[in-house]
Amino acid sequence: MKKTLAAVAVLGAFAGSALAADVTLYGVVDLGLQYTHSDPDTAAGATDKLQMASGSEAGPRFGLKGVEQLGNGVEVGFVLENGFSADTGALGNNNRLFGRQSTLFVRGSFGEIAFGRMGQLTSGNGSYGLTGNLSPFGTSWGGSVEGSTYMVGYNRMDNTVVYKTPTFGGFTVYAQYSSDMNTLVQDTTENKGNSNRYYALGATFNAGALNLVGTVDSYNWDSSNGKMEQLDDGLTVTLGGSYDFGVAKA
């Protein structure tokens, strides 16, 4: 009974977000023709290909975001972001309707807390990814640079909660946890040994042109008899930053 009452109380606290007074529709469409010439220096010879390509620089998307003021400096809101292939119209992110981000948040003088599907701290994705600016290419070009530079495993996760502190002296601290990172590809139970779980702490420092990022994250892989049973739990430490000189950024 206590669990039921607690769940009702949480839902009631966030119910106002469904009637957000300020809703924004946004999107990106990246579509063009792509020509490639490949010569592997084998008996097969060179190949040429001309095709329509979606998302060469930035993934096509559309989204909705809204905010409702509750008073006393507290507000609730949501972000719903869909990914799709612009050349076919097909849904992306394993056929999810809002696969790029689906979050409900509350923020105020205490900081910000959000729930749902979101980018992990050690990614450049969504509202809470911290490390996208560590690469000069960010998350563009299909995220290929992002994936090989500072990130291991999933870049967006289901069943996730994140807390962001207020900013003090340029510092902001983050904590994130996913009870089951990807529910579409495995028969799992949240917070149990047969689910892939994620823990992370992160911090940013911003002072004018100087931006610093640090994260520590851990993957607690499925320990059941599933496909992940041979994987050791992972631990990643990421440090980086940038400085904007005006004419160039390093």
What are these regions (language model features)?
Residues 1-250:
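Outer-membrane beta-barrel proteins
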